[in-house]
């Protein structure tokens, strides 16, 4: 990577590289050997965070950060009062991602590599993908795979998820109730992400699909404060960002 930040043969500064590093589900010990090496070597580290809160990605990577690295915090806009399917929500996030691109691009054009920390895997429901889509045509981008958040939840819940020829479906809970119920009914096993303010709707969809009795609720899987229970036993409809619902498969076994 250092060669990317050097001077080219004609004396013009070479462009830097964007390095997306997957951090795994939350436990720093689930950071891969390669990710730890890349983080430790990074001169510029960027990470997403909610304004006024510690970055979860930075907290995971903290044991591996070089003490003299430059840090760039990318603070999400406050969108909790705007429904995700409204134009204002999309426009707010679009402006945010364009601002992030501007900041990162300035570093890359100056010949500096930027390591962008990503919870879970960089290419699964991650903000890194928005940087990748906007910068890939001009800059070199390296991607270090991470243990997915769902894998961390499988292990935390001690749930075999897909047997034999089971079909495993990954769903965002932001879908409308009818689509959730339909998808849950037609698959063998499911992972439902982005529970947030969608838990009551998901519960209803699972009852309609006939899977509520085998659904597992995992909150903060592979993180401090981990909670695991049968979904039907959860008494309230509050679900934080770091929560998932699992519907284990029951397919062919030897």
Describe these PLM feature segments.
Residues 2-28, 33-138, 223, 228-229, ...:
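Class I S-adenosyl-L-methionine
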Residues 18, 184-254:
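A contiguous loop/helix-start segment that scaffolds small-molecule binding in enzyme catalytic cores
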Residues 18-20, 71-73, 141-143, 170, ...:
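Conserved beta-strand scaffold positions in the cores of enzyme catalytic domains, especially
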Residues 25-26, 50-52, 76-77, 147-149, ...:
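Short, acidic/turn-prone active-site loops that include or flank metal/cofactor-
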Residues 47-48, 73, 116-118, 143-146, ...:
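General beta-strand structural signal in soluble alpha/beta enzymes
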Residues 120-186, 236, 249-253:
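Class I SAM-dependent methyltransferase SAM-binding "motif I" and its flanking Rossmann-like core
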């Amino acid at each position: 990577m250092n060669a990317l930040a050097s001077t080219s043969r004609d004396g013009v500064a070479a462009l830097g590289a964007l390095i997306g590093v997957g951090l795994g589900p939350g436990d720093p010990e689930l950071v891969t050997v390669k990710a730890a090496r890349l983080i430790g070597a990074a001169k510029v580290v960027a990470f997403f965070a909610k304004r006024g809160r510690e970055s979860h990605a930075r907290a995971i990577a903290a044991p591996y950060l070089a003490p003299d690295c430059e840090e760039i915090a990318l603070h999400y806009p406050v969108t909790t009062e705007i429904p995700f399917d409204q134009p204002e929500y999309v426009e707010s996030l679009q402006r945010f991602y364009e601002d992030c691109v501007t900041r990162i691009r300035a570093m890359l054009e100056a010949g500096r590599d930027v390591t962008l920390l990503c919870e879970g895997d960089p290419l699964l429901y991650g903000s890194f993908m928005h940087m990748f889509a906007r910068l890939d045509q001009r800059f070199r981008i390296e991607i270090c795979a991470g243990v997915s958040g769902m894998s961390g939840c499988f292990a935390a819940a001690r749930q075999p998820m897909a047997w034999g020829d089971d079909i495993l479906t990954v769903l965002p809970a932001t879908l409308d109730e009818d689509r959730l119920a339909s998808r849950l009914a037609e698959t063998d096993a499911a992972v439902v992400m982005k529970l947030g303010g969608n838990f009551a709707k998901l519960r209803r969809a699972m009852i309609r699909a006939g899977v509520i009795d085998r659904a597992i609720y995992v909150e903060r899987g592979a993180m401090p404060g981990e909670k695991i229970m049968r979904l039907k036993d959860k008494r309230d409809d509050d679900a934080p960002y770091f929560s998932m619902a699992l519907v284990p498969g029951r397919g062919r076994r030897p």
